[in-house]
Amino acid sequence: MEQVNSKRTYLAIDLKSFYASVECVKRGLDPLTARLVVADESRTEKTICLAVSPALKALGIYGRARLFEVYEKVPRGSFIIAKPAMADYLQVSSEIFAIYAAYVATEDIHVYSVDEAFLDITSYLRTYEMDAEQLARTIIKDVLGHTGITATAGLGSNLYLAKIAMDILAKHQTADLDGVRIASLDETSYRKLLWQHQPLTDFWRIGPGISKSLHNFGIYTMGDLARFSLTASEKLYRKFGVNAELIIDHAWGIEPTTIADIKSYRRKDHSISSGQVLATGLYFEKLRNILIEMADKLCHELHEKQLLTNNLTLHLSYDKKADSTSVKPFAHGSKSFSYTDESNLIIEYFLQLLAQILDPTRPVKKLSLTLGHLKPVDLITTQLDLFDNQKITERASRNQNLEQATLKIKQKYGKNAILRGTSYLEGSTMRERNQQIGGHRA
Protein backbone atom coordinates (compact mmCIF):
# COMPACT_ATOMS: atom_id res chain seq x y z
CA MET A 1 0.00 0.00 0.00
CA GLU A 2 1.45 3.33 -1.10
CA GLN A 3 1.14 6.17 1.40
CA VAL A 4 -0.24 9.42 0.05
CA ASN A 5 0.76 12.97 0.85
CA SER A 6 -1.39 13.68 3.91
CA LYS A 7 -0.69 17.41 3.65
CA ARG A 8 -3.15 17.89 0.80
CA THR A 9 -6.70 19.04 1.49
CA TYR A 10 -9.57 18.10 -0.81
CA LEU A 11 -13.12 19.41 -0.79
CA ALA A 12 -16.00 17.31 -2.13
CA ILE A 13 -19.28 19.15 -2.78
CA ASP A 14 -22.66 17.51 -3.44
CA LEU A 15 -25.48 19.86 -4.44
CA LYS A 16 -28.50 18.89 -2.37
CA SER A 17 -31.30 17.20 -4.38
CA PHE A 18 -29.96 19.15 -7.36
CA TYR A 19 -32.64 18.64 -10.02
CA ALA A 20 -35.43 19.13 -7.48
CA SER A 21 -33.73 22.22 -6.06
CA VAL A 22 -33.42 23.80 -9.52
CA GLU A 23 -37.14 23.21 -10.11
CA CYS A 24 -38.03 24.71 -6.72
CA VAL A 25 -35.94 27.83 -7.37
CA LYS A 26 -37.56 28.24 -10.81
CA ARG A 27 -40.94 28.34 -9.04
CA GLY A 28 -39.82 30.70 -6.28
CA LEU A 29 -40.07 27.91 -3.68
CA ASP A 30 -37.70 27.04 -0.84
CA PRO A 31 -35.86 23.85 -1.91
CA LEU A 32 -35.62 22.71 1.71
CA THR A 33 -39.35 22.90 2.49
CA ALA A 34 -41.18 22.48 -0.84
CA ARG A 35 -42.67 19.11 -1.74
CA LEU A 36 -41.53 18.37 -5.28
CA VAL A 37 -40.40 15.45 -7.41
CA VAL A 38 -38.78 15.57 -10.83
CA ALA A 39 -40.51 13.03 -13.06
CA ASP A 40 -42.16 12.78 -16.46
CA GLU A 41 -45.68 11.67 -15.56
CA SER A 42 -46.52 11.31 -19.26
CA ARG A 43 -44.49 8.09 -19.09
CA THR A 44 -47.08 6.56 -16.70
CA GLU A 45 -47.00 6.26 -12.92
CA LYS A 46 -44.22 3.68 -13.16
CA THR A 47 -41.77 6.36 -14.29
CA ILE A 48 -38.74 6.82 -12.05
CA CYS A 49 -38.37 10.08 -10.13
CA LEU A 50 -35.05 11.66 -11.07
CA ALA A 51 -34.99 13.71 -7.88
CA VAL A 52 -36.98 14.18 -4.69
CA SER A 53 -36.92 17.32 -2.55
CA PRO A 54 -35.65 17.08 1.06
CA ALA A 55 -39.16 17.64 2.44
CA LEU A 56 -40.40 14.50 0.68
CA LYS A 57 -37.28 12.54 1.64
CA ALA A 58 -38.18 13.30 5.24
CA LEU A 59 -41.43 11.40 4.61
CA GLY A 60 -39.55 8.30 3.53
CA ILE A 61 -39.51 8.94 -0.22
CA TYR A 62 -36.06 8.62 -1.71
CA GLY A 63 -34.45 9.33 -5.06
CA ARG A 64 -35.17 6.80 -7.84
CA ALA A 65 -38.60 6.02 -6.36
CA ARG A 66 -41.31 5.38 -8.90
CA LEU A 67 -44.12 7.90 -9.13
CA PHE A 68 -46.78 5.47 -7.90
CA GLU A 69 -44.66 4.91 -4.76
CA VAL A 70 -44.84 8.65 -4.06
CA TYR A 71 -48.64 8.55 -4.45
CA GLU A 72 -48.75 5.72 -1.89
CA LYS A 73 -47.17 7.95 0.77
CA VAL A 74 -48.30 11.46 -0.18
CA PRO A 75 -51.82 12.50 -1.29
CA ARG A 76 -52.19 13.58 -4.89
CA GLY A 77 -52.20 17.34 -5.22
CA SER A 78 -50.08 17.85 -2.11
CA PHE A 79 -46.81 17.91 -4.02
CA ILE A 80 -45.50 19.22 -7.34
CA ILE A 81 -44.47 16.99 -10.23
CA ALA A 82 -41.88 18.83 -12.32
CA LYS A 83 -41.08 17.54 -15.79
CA PRO A 84 -37.31 17.05 -16.26
CA ALA A 85 -35.57 19.98 -17.94
CA MET A 86 -32.03 18.73 -18.49
CA ALA A 87 -30.84 21.84 -20.33
CA ASP A 88 -31.77 23.95 -17.29
CA TYR A 89 -29.86 21.64 -14.95
CA LEU A 90 -26.76 21.76 -17.13
CA GLN A 91 -26.98 25.55 -17.30
CA VAL A 92 -27.19 25.91 -13.51
CA SER A 93 -24.39 23.37 -13.11
CA SER A 94 -22.15 25.44 -15.38
CA GLU A 95 -22.99 28.58 -13.38
CA ILE A 96 -21.99 26.79 -10.18
CA PHE A 97 -18.74 25.62 -11.78
CA ALA A 98 -17.97 29.27 -12.55
CA ILE A 99 -18.40 30.05 -8.84
CA TYR A 100 -15.95 27.27 -7.91
CA ALA A 101 -13.53 28.64 -10.51
CA ALA A 102 -13.70 32.07 -8.87
CA TYR A 103 -12.03 30.54 -5.80
CA VAL A 104 -9.92 27.74 -7.26
CA ALA A 105 -8.08 27.36 -10.58
CA THR A 106 -9.86 25.07 -13.03
CA GLU A 107 -6.92 22.63 -13.00
CA ASP A 108 -7.71 22.07 -9.31
CA ILE A 109 -11.39 21.22 -9.99
CA HIS A 110 -12.70 17.80 -11.03
CA VAL A 111 -16.37 17.69 -12.02
CA TYR A 112 -17.50 14.22 -10.97
CA SER A 113 -21.11 14.62 -12.13
CA VAL A 114 -23.65 17.35 -12.87
CA ASP A 115 -24.20 17.84 -9.11
CA GLU A 116 -20.90 16.75 -7.58
CA ALA A 117 -17.34 18.10 -7.75
CA PHE A 118 -13.94 17.77 -6.10
CA LEU A 119 -11.66 20.74 -5.40
CA ASP A 120 -8.01 20.63 -4.33
CA ILE A 121 -7.96 23.58 -1.93
CA THR A 122 -4.50 22.92 -0.47
CA SER A 123 -2.71 25.96 -1.87
CA TYR A 124 -5.67 28.32 -1.36
CA LEU A 125 -5.97 28.14 2.43
CA ARG A 126 -3.04 30.49 2.93
CA THR A 127 -4.23 32.74 0.08
CA TYR A 128 -7.64 33.31 1.71
CA GLU A 129 -6.29 33.07 5.28
CA MET A 130 -8.95 30.49 6.13
CA ASP A 131 -8.97 26.95 7.41
CA ALA A 132 -10.49 24.24 5.22
CA GLU A 133 -13.96 24.35 6.75
CA GLN A 134 -14.14 28.14 6.52
CA LEU A 135 -13.23 28.08 2.82
CA ALA A 136 -15.67 25.24 2.15
CA ARG A 137 -18.48 27.12 3.87
CA THR A 138 -17.62 30.34 2.02
CA ILE A 139 -17.81 28.62 -1.38
CA ILE A 140 -21.06 26.82 -0.54
CA LYS A 141 -22.69 30.01 0.78
CA ASP A 142 -21.67 31.78 -2.43
CA VAL A 143 -23.37 29.05 -4.47
CA LEU A 144 -26.46 29.37 -2.27
CA GLY A 145 -26.53 33.14 -2.65
CA HIS A 146 -26.29 33.03 -6.44
CA THR A 147 -28.47 29.99 -7.20
CA GLY A 148 -30.62 29.29 -4.14
CA ILE A 149 -29.16 25.76 -3.98
CA THR A 150 -27.46 24.41 -0.86
CA ALA A 151 -24.92 21.61 -0.57
CA THR A 152 -23.31 18.94 1.57
CA ALA A 153 -19.51 18.88 1.71
CA GLY A 154 -16.66 16.65 2.80
CA LEU A 155 -13.04 17.52 3.55
CA GLY A 156 -10.28 14.94 3.36
CA SER A 157 -6.56 14.40 3.08
CA ASN A 158 -7.25 12.53 -0.17
CA LEU A 159 -10.10 12.33 -2.67
CA TYR A 160 -11.54 9.14 -1.18
CA LEU A 161 -11.69 10.52 2.36
CA ALA A 162 -13.27 13.76 1.14
CA LYS A 163 -16.03 11.79 -0.58
CA ILE A 164 -16.58 9.44 2.36
CA ALA A 165 -16.73 12.40 4.76
CA MET A 166 -19.42 13.88 2.51
CA ASP A 167 -21.36 10.67 1.78
CA ILE A 168 -21.41 9.12 5.26
CA LEU A 169 -20.48 11.62 7.97
CA ALA A 170 -21.85 14.93 6.64
CA LYS A 171 -25.19 13.51 5.53
CA HIS A 172 -25.84 12.32 9.08
CA GLN A 173 -24.98 15.63 10.72
CA THR A 174 -27.43 18.32 11.77
CA ALA A 175 -27.62 20.96 9.05
CA ASP A 176 -27.21 24.67 9.69
CA LEU A 177 -30.05 27.10 8.94
CA ASP A 178 -29.18 27.03 5.23
CA GLY A 179 -29.15 23.23 5.09
CA VAL A 180 -25.35 23.06 4.84
CA ARG A 181 -23.49 20.08 6.28
CA ILE A 182 -19.68 19.74 6.34
CA ALA A 183 -17.59 16.88 7.72
CA SER A 184 -13.87 16.14 7.68
CA LEU A 185 -11.67 13.02 7.68
CA ASP A 186 -8.01 12.06 7.62
CA GLU A 187 -6.64 8.52 7.72
CA THR A 188 -6.56 8.41 11.53
CA SER A 189 -10.09 9.73 12.10
CA TYR A 190 -11.39 7.52 9.27
CA ARG A 191 -10.17 4.40 11.05
CA LYS A 192 -11.52 5.64 14.37
CA LEU A 193 -14.94 6.73 13.14
CA LEU A 194 -15.73 4.41 10.24
CA TRP A 195 -13.88 1.12 10.63
CA GLN A 196 -16.95 -0.30 12.39
CA HIS A 197 -19.54 1.34 10.10
CA GLN A 198 -22.10 -0.86 8.36
CA PRO A 199 -23.25 -1.58 5.72
CA LEU A 200 -20.23 -1.79 3.45
CA THR A 201 -22.34 -0.56 0.53
CA ASP A 202 -22.30 2.93 2.08
CA PHE A 203 -18.68 3.19 0.99
CA TRP A 204 -17.69 4.50 -2.42
CA ARG A 205 -17.08 1.78 -5.03
CA ILE A 206 -18.52 -1.07 -2.94
CA GLY A 207 -21.74 -2.31 -4.48
CA PRO A 208 -23.96 -5.24 -3.46
CA GLY A 209 -21.89 -7.76 -5.45
CA ILE A 210 -18.56 -6.83 -3.87
CA SER A 211 -20.19 -6.57 -0.45
CA LYS A 212 -21.62 -10.09 -0.76
CA SER A 213 -18.24 -11.48 -1.80
CA LEU A 214 -16.59 -9.81 1.18
CA HIS A 215 -19.24 -11.26 3.49
CA ASN A 216 -18.22 -14.71 2.24
CA PHE A 217 -14.76 -13.99 3.70
CA GLY A 218 -16.32 -12.94 7.01
CA ILE A 219 -15.74 -9.25 6.21
CA TYR A 220 -18.55 -6.91 7.27
CA THR A 221 -16.73 -3.64 7.99
CA MET A 222 -13.80 -1.68 6.59
CA GLY A 223 -11.91 -2.57 9.77
CA ASP A 224 -12.50 -6.26 9.03
CA LEU A 225 -11.22 -5.72 5.48
CA ALA A 226 -8.09 -3.89 6.64
CA ARG A 227 -7.20 -6.62 9.13
CA PHE A 228 -7.96 -9.38 6.62
CA SER A 229 -5.61 -7.75 4.09
CA LEU A 230 -2.68 -8.06 6.52
CA THR A 231 -2.73 -11.86 6.48
CA ALA A 232 -4.79 -13.00 3.47
CA SER A 233 -4.52 -10.34 0.77
CA GLU A 234 -3.82 -13.05 -1.83
CA LYS A 235 -7.40 -14.27 -1.40
CA LEU A 236 -8.69 -10.80 -2.21
CA TYR A 237 -6.50 -10.59 -5.33
CA ARG A 238 -7.71 -14.00 -6.50
CA LYS A 239 -11.31 -12.87 -6.07
CA PHE A 240 -11.18 -9.26 -7.27
CA GLY A 241 -8.07 -9.12 -9.46
CA VAL A 242 -6.51 -5.67 -9.79
CA ASN A 243 -9.54 -4.12 -8.04
CA ALA A 244 -8.33 -5.73 -4.82
CA GLU A 245 -5.64 -3.06 -4.53
CA LEU A 246 -8.28 -0.33 -4.61
CA ILE A 247 -10.56 -1.82 -1.98
CA ILE A 248 -7.60 -2.64 0.30
CA ASP A 249 -6.29 0.92 0.00
CA HIS A 250 -9.76 2.28 0.73
CA ALA A 251 -10.07 0.05 3.79
CA TRP A 252 -7.01 1.82 5.18
CA GLY A 253 -8.23 5.25 4.05
CA ILE A 254 -5.60 5.50 1.32
CA GLU A 255 -6.17 6.95 -2.17
CA PRO A 256 -3.05 7.82 -4.22
CA THR A 257 -4.94 9.35 -7.17
CA THR A 258 -4.91 13.14 -7.31
CA ILE A 259 -6.94 15.62 -9.37
CA ALA A 260 -3.81 16.18 -11.47
CA ASP A 261 -3.78 12.43 -12.24
CA ILE A 262 -7.43 12.56 -13.28
CA LYS A 263 -6.82 15.59 -15.49
CA SER A 264 -3.92 13.89 -17.27
CA TYR A 265 -5.83 10.66 -17.92
CA ARG A 266 -7.13 10.19 -21.44
CA ARG A 267 -9.71 7.46 -21.93
CA LYS A 268 -9.39 5.34 -25.04
CA ASP A 269 -12.79 4.72 -26.60
CA HIS A 270 -12.96 1.12 -27.79
CA SER A 271 -16.72 1.10 -28.37
CA ILE A 272 -19.79 3.30 -28.54
CA SER A 273 -23.32 2.16 -27.85
CA SER A 274 -26.94 3.24 -27.81
CA GLY A 275 -29.82 1.67 -25.92
CA GLN A 276 -33.54 2.32 -25.78
CA VAL A 277 -36.44 1.07 -23.67
CA LEU A 278 -39.52 1.18 -25.89
CA ALA A 279 -42.86 2.48 -24.67
CA THR A 280 -44.48 -0.72 -25.91
CA GLY A 281 -43.25 -4.01 -27.32
CA LEU A 282 -42.61 -3.87 -31.09
CA TYR A 283 -42.52 -6.50 -33.81
CA PHE A 284 -40.14 -6.66 -36.76
CA GLU A 285 -41.39 -3.90 -39.09
CA LYS A 286 -41.60 -1.11 -36.50
CA LEU A 287 -38.56 -2.43 -34.65
CA ARG A 288 -36.62 -2.31 -37.91
CA ASN A 289 -37.32 1.42 -38.24
CA ILE A 290 -36.20 2.11 -34.67
CA LEU A 291 -33.01 0.13 -35.26
CA ILE A 292 -32.22 2.12 -38.42
CA GLU A 293 -32.59 5.38 -36.49
CA MET A 294 -30.36 4.21 -33.65
CA ALA A 295 -27.71 2.82 -35.99
CA ASP A 296 -27.72 6.05 -37.97
CA LYS A 297 -27.17 8.04 -34.78
CA LEU A 298 -24.23 5.82 -33.82
CA CYS A 299 -22.73 6.39 -37.26
CA HIS A 300 -23.15 10.13 -36.74
CA GLU A 301 -21.08 9.77 -33.55
CA LEU A 302 -18.44 7.81 -35.50
CA HIS A 303 -18.13 10.64 -38.00
CA GLU A 304 -17.96 13.29 -35.27
CA LYS A 305 -15.11 11.45 -33.55
CA GLN A 306 -13.47 10.44 -36.87
CA LEU A 307 -13.46 6.75 -36.00
CA LEU A 308 -13.86 3.50 -37.90
CA THR A 309 -15.36 0.21 -36.69
CA ASN A 310 -15.08 -3.42 -37.73
CA ASN A 311 -17.48 -5.01 -35.26
CA LEU A 312 -21.07 -4.52 -34.15
CA THR A 313 -23.30 -6.10 -31.53
CA LEU A 314 -27.09 -6.19 -31.18
CA HIS A 315 -28.93 -7.13 -27.98
CA LEU A 316 -32.72 -7.52 -27.79
CA SER A 317 -34.88 -8.00 -24.70
CA TYR A 318 -38.37 -9.36 -25.33
CA ASP A 319 -41.47 -7.86 -23.71
CA LYS A 320 -42.09 -9.93 -20.57
CA LYS A 321 -45.69 -8.78 -20.21
CA ALA A 322 -46.65 -9.83 -23.71
CA ASP A 323 -44.64 -13.03 -23.51
CA SER A 324 -44.59 -14.87 -20.19
CA THR A 325 -43.18 -18.09 -21.62
CA SER A 326 -40.10 -19.67 -20.09
CA VAL A 327 -38.06 -19.40 -23.28
CA LYS A 328 -34.94 -17.21 -23.37
CA PRO A 329 -35.96 -13.60 -22.61
CA PHE A 330 -33.36 -12.03 -24.88
CA ALA A 331 -31.51 -12.40 -28.18
CA HIS A 332 -27.92 -11.44 -28.84
CA GLY A 333 -25.59 -11.42 -31.81
CA SER A 334 -22.47 -9.82 -33.25
CA LYS A 335 -20.88 -9.36 -36.66
CA SER A 336 -17.35 -8.54 -37.84
CA PHE A 337 -16.35 -6.91 -41.13
CA SER A 338 -13.65 -4.71 -42.69
CA TYR A 339 -13.09 -1.34 -41.03
CA THR A 340 -15.59 1.28 -42.20
CA ASP A 341 -17.58 4.33 -41.16
CA GLU A 342 -20.12 4.11 -43.98
CA SER A 343 -23.59 4.54 -42.52
CA ASN A 344 -25.40 2.52 -45.18
CA LEU A 345 -23.07 -0.46 -44.73
CA ILE A 346 -23.27 -0.41 -40.94
CA ILE A 347 -27.07 -0.09 -40.98
CA GLU A 348 -27.31 -2.98 -43.43
CA TYR A 349 -25.13 -5.13 -41.15
CA PHE A 350 -27.39 -4.32 -38.19
CA LEU A 351 -30.48 -5.25 -40.23
CA GLN A 352 -28.90 -8.55 -41.27
CA LEU A 353 -28.14 -9.29 -37.62
CA LEU A 354 -31.69 -8.37 -36.59
CA ALA A 355 -33.11 -10.82 -39.13
CA GLN A 356 -30.78 -13.54 -37.84
CA ILE A 357 -31.45 -13.28 -34.11
CA LEU A 358 -35.04 -12.00 -33.82
CA ASP A 359 -37.93 -14.31 -33.07
CA PRO A 360 -40.59 -12.56 -35.23
CA THR A 361 -43.43 -13.95 -33.09
CA ARG A 362 -42.27 -12.07 -29.96
CA PRO A 363 -42.39 -8.29 -29.31
CA VAL A 364 -39.19 -6.52 -28.29
CA LYS A 365 -39.19 -4.09 -25.34
CA LYS A 366 -35.51 -3.09 -25.18
CA LEU A 367 -32.68 -2.97 -27.69
CA SER A 368 -29.03 -2.05 -27.49
CA LEU A 369 -26.61 -1.42 -30.36
CA THR A 370 -22.81 -1.31 -30.04
CA LEU A 371 -20.02 -0.48 -32.47
CA GLY A 372 -16.74 -1.98 -31.29
CA HIS A 373 -13.01 -2.21 -32.01
CA LEU A 374 -12.92 1.50 -32.79
CA LYS A 375 -9.84 3.02 -34.41
CA PRO A 376 -9.01 6.55 -35.61
CA VAL A 377 -9.54 7.02 -39.34
CA ASP A 378 -5.92 8.01 -39.94
CA LEU A 379 -4.59 4.78 -38.37
CA ILE A 380 -6.51 2.40 -40.60
CA THR A 381 -5.54 1.52 -44.15
CA THR A 382 -8.51 0.05 -45.95
CA GLN A 383 -7.72 -3.30 -47.53
CA LEU A 384 -9.41 -3.20 -50.91
CA ASP A 385 -10.13 -6.05 -53.26
CA LEU A 386 -7.53 -6.15 -56.04
CA PHE A 387 -10.10 -6.03 -58.84
CA ASP A 388 -12.47 -3.51 -57.25
CA ASN A 389 -9.98 -0.89 -56.09
CA GLN A 390 -11.22 2.02 -58.16
CA LYS A 391 -14.92 1.23 -57.80
CA ILE A 392 -14.77 0.84 -54.01
CA THR A 393 -12.56 3.88 -53.57
CA GLU A 394 -14.97 6.04 -55.58
CA ARG A 395 -17.96 4.76 -53.60
CA ALA A 396 -16.19 5.33 -50.27
CA SER A 397 -15.23 8.84 -51.34
CA ARG A 398 -18.81 9.71 -52.34
CA ASN A 399 -20.19 8.31 -49.10
CA GLN A 400 -17.59 10.15 -47.04
CA ASN A 401 -18.46 13.44 -48.72
CA LEU A 402 -22.15 12.81 -48.03
CA GLU A 403 -21.47 11.91 -44.37
CA GLN A 404 -19.39 15.06 -43.83
CA ALA A 405 -22.02 17.28 -45.47
CA THR A 406 -24.73 15.74 -43.28
CA LEU A 407 -22.57 16.20 -40.19
CA LYS A 408 -22.01 19.90 -40.93
CA ILE A 409 -25.75 20.50 -41.45
CA LYS A 410 -26.61 18.84 -38.12
CA GLN A 411 -23.88 20.72 -36.28
CA LYS A 412 -25.14 24.04 -37.62
CA TYR A 413 -28.92 23.57 -37.60
CA GLY A 414 -29.50 20.79 -35.05
CA LYS A 415 -29.85 17.02 -35.12
CA ASN A 416 -33.37 17.16 -36.58
CA ALA A 417 -32.31 19.34 -39.52
CA ILE A 418 -31.76 16.31 -41.74
CA LEU A 419 -33.18 12.86 -41.04
CA ARG A 420 -33.84 9.58 -42.79
CA GLY A 421 -37.37 9.02 -44.09
CA THR A 422 -37.92 6.33 -41.44
CA SER A 423 -37.81 9.05 -38.78
CA TYR A 424 -41.16 10.35 -40.06
CA LEU A 425 -42.94 7.01 -39.89
CA GLU A 426 -45.42 6.11 -37.17
CA GLY A 427 -43.64 4.85 -34.07
CA SER A 428 -40.40 6.70 -34.79
CA THR A 429 -38.59 7.98 -31.69
CA MET A 430 -35.59 9.74 -33.23
CA ARG A 431 -37.02 13.26 -33.49
CA GLU A 432 -38.08 13.22 -29.84
CA ARG A 433 -34.81 11.60 -28.68
CA ASN A 434 -32.80 14.23 -30.53
CA GLN A 435 -34.42 16.84 -28.29
CA GLN A 436 -33.48 14.98 -25.11
CA ILE A 437 -30.45 15.10 -22.84
CA GLY A 438 -29.61 11.89 -21.01
CA GLY A 439 -32.87 10.32 -22.12
CA HIS A 440 -34.99 13.17 -20.74
CA ARG A 441 -36.47 16.26 -22.32
CA ALA A 442 -34.12 19.19 -22.58
Where do the language-model regions lie?
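Residues that scaffold, gate, or flank divalent-cation-dependent active/transport sites
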Residues: M1-V114, F118, D249, A295
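DNA-contacting surface of Y-family translesion DNA polymerases
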Residues: Q3, A12, D202, K212-P363
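Acidic, metal-coordinating catalytic segment for phosphate/diphosphate chemistry
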Residues: V22, K328-A442
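Short acidic, glycine/serine/threonine-rich loops at helix termini
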Residues: V22-V25, I48-A51, L161-L169, T258-K263, ...
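Short Gly/Ser/Thr- and Asp/Glu-enriched loop/turn motifs at secondary-structure junctions
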Residues: Y112-E116, G156-L159, L307-N311, R362-K366
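Long, highly charged, low-complexity intrinsically disordered interaction regions
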Residues: L135, I139-T201
